[in-house]
């Protein structure tokens, strides 16, 4: 028997799914949306929050809520009152979170039109529009940070004792978080110590140049007893983290936060090269940066 006849023939099954190209990776998925900073914060650092929006007229002008988390990390849910909820902290993701949120929203809209409620699942590998393509950018509300996952339930529904107990347990497990008054993107949280995390839409290299200038001058802090401790990189944005003086609340640091934000804005406009001290400060800042997505 010849070599050719001894070769194993590979049969192609008719049931074998067709090749699906992967969803292209997008480093900064929510870029271009007016609420980019809030969406990144909800995805990465805020445990419980709600942001309301509306689709374009082409997609029905439907109102919906983007929320931090849904039961078991599902991507979408339709409450018994018909309200559509789309989750950001989900179990499965493609390389483009904007694609995933839009796919979940469209799936929920279809389920709603079919008279379905409850949790909705999607396959994030399937092609779909991006969030920027299907929402009205002018229709977003202000984000609301809430104490628990009460948004899972119809607000007109009387909760059972089991539901109330579950919410109480969830509330006990949630890291206390609050927006620093008057400063976009700054969020206070209480863990083993109190911290402020600053989500900035400024280009990362420019932001670290600005922070280096402030650090070298001793101004990269939020009041007495605070210090810069590092940074995250998430959804294409840098998120500097400041440890606060013991017991300091969001309100306590509001004035210092305002001064820091103003100083960062001024430093972002600076075009002179970094000094030697500023370069050393920048190296220290970058060495403490961690990518979480």
Regions found by a protein language model. Give the residues of each.
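N-terminal membrane-targeting/anchoring modules of bacterial envelope and secretion proteins
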Residues: 1-149
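Long, contiguous binding/interaction regions
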Residues: 5, 172-179, 289-293
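Short beta-strand-to-loop capping motifs
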Residues: 88-90, 198-202, 241-246
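Surface-exposed beta-loop interaction hotspot
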Residues: 116-190
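Short glycine-rich, basic-tinged beta-strand/loop micro-motifs
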Residues: 191-197, 239
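Short, internal acidic amphipathic alpha-helical interface segments
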Residues: 202-234
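Alpha-helical oligomerization segments
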Residues: 225-293
